[in-house]
């Protein structure tokens, strides 16, 4: 482990790989190293999913879940340094439920609505007129 400046510690893959137990657990996320030993018992998904990624780059697994902003805030407190040679990238935050693609009018829903309205008019005219 070496210091590139007074605030950031740089770790190698080998150093991170030595921290794989419940009481001493590190992971790599987006080129950053996190000591999540004190958080593992609080993890909503259970400790098994974290232990499966212990000592490795867990970026893909973390991003696939789509963690909340709160999860990212917790990570900030667990950050201990950067991975040697890694390009630091911003973590992907969970997508909101509404995207540009699905925020428009939903055609099948409109078609059903038009059908029901037409049926209602037909039913009214044949039974009450």
From Swiss-Prot:
Q: What does this protein do?
A: Membrane bound hemoprotein which function as an electron carrier for several membrane bound oxygenases.
Q: Name one GO biological process term.
A: sterol biosynthetic process
Membrane-spanning residues: 104-124
Which lineage?
Eukaryota, Fungi, Dikarya, Ascomycota, Saccharomycotina
Q: Does the keyword Endoplasmic reticulum apply?
A: yes
Which residues belong to any copy of the Cytochrome b5 heme-binding domain? 8-84
The entry sums up its family as follows: Belongs to the cytochrome b5 family.
Q: Which organism is it from?
A: Candida tropicalis
Query: One Pfam family from the UniProt entry?
Result: Cyt-b5
Q: How is the protein disposed in the membrane?
A: Single-pass membrane protein
* Name of the protein described by the UniProt record: Cytochrome b5
Q: Which InterPro entries match?
A: Cyt_B5-like_heme/steroid-bd, Cyt_B5-like_heme/steroid_sf, Cyt_B5_heme-BS, Cytochrome_b5
């Amino acid at each position: 482990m070496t210091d590139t400046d007074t605030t950031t510690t740089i770790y190698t893959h080998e150093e991170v790989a030595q921290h794989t137990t419940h009481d001493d657990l590190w992971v790599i996320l987006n080129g950053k190293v996190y000591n999540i030993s004190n958080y593992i018992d609080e993890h909503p998904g259970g400790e098994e999913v974290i232990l499966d990624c212990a000592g490795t780059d867990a970026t893909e697994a973390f991003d696939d879940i789509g963690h909340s902003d709160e999860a990212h805030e917790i990570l900030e407190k667990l950050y201990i340094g950067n991975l040697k040679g890694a390009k630091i990238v911003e973590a992907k935050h969970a997508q909101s439920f509404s995207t540009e693609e699905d925020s428009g009018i939903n055609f099948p829903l409109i078609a059903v609505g038009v059908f029901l309205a037409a049926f209602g008019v037909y039913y009214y005219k044949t039974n009450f007129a």
